[in-house]
C-alpha cells in the first residue's frame, strides 16, 4: 500500500488529483464512496473540483437500516452537496429496507454495471471501513451489519437518544471492496493513529477490517501527521 502523509490540505489535493486521473482514464467509471468516517473536506473538495462526473456512476457504500436510512441524518444525506455540484450519470444506494436475503442484490447491481473502478473510504478509529465493524469477515459482500455500541454512541446525537439510534446498517463488504480496481483510504486525526498503524503494519485480521486492504494491489492511504504518528 502506498502511504501519503502531509497536511490535510495537501493530502486532499493529492487524493483529488488521483480521482481526476481515474475519471480522465475512464469517464464512465463506477465509484463507491463511504461517507462514514470520511472527512467531510474530501467530499467538499470533490464538489469544488473541476472533475466531470457526468458519465460516472456513484455507488453509496453504506446506509442505516430502516427509517434512519431515509431521513435527514441518513448517510446518503452527506452526498447531497457533491451530487448537487457534480451530477453523476447514475447514483445508487443500498436499500435501507433490504433484509439479509436481499442485501447482496446490491453486489449484483455493482457487477451488472461492470464492477467498481474506484472505492473511497474513511478509516474508522477501530480500523473499520464503511459499516464493516471489527470482526467483519473477509469474504462478505453487501450485508446487514450490527452497529457496534461505540458506533451508535458516536452518532446518537443525530437521532436524539441512543434508544432512537439505528442498530444496523447495510454495507458493501470487504469482498466487494477488494474487488475494486483501486482503493483510496483516508484517515485524519490522532483518533486514527492506532488504526492506521494496525492497517499498515499489522497482519490482515478481522478485528481490523481495514487491514484486509493489504491484500489488494492498488491501495493508497492518505493520512495527516496526527494519524501517521504511530507508523
Task: Kindly give the residue locations of the regions a language model identified.
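ATP/nucleoside-binding phosphotransfer catalytic cores, i.e., glycine-rich phosphate-binding loops
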Residues: 175, 179-231
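Class I SAM-dependent methyltransferase SAM-binding "motif I" and its flanking Rossmann-like core
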Residues: 130-174
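A glycine-rich beta-strand to alpha-helix segment
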Residues: 29-33, 38, 109-136
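Short beta-strand segments
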Residues: 32-34, 60, 94, 120-123, ...
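N-terminal glycine-/serine-/threonine-rich phosphate-binding loop
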Residues: 1-31, 100
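Ligand-binding beta-strand-loop-alpha-helix segment within the catalytic cores
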Residues: 53-120
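A glycine- and small-aliphatic-rich helix-loop capping segment at beta-alpha/alpha-beta transitions
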Residues: 41, 45-53, 79, 134-143
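Glycine-rich N-terminal segment of FAD-binding domains in flavoprotein oxidoreductases
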Residues: 24-48
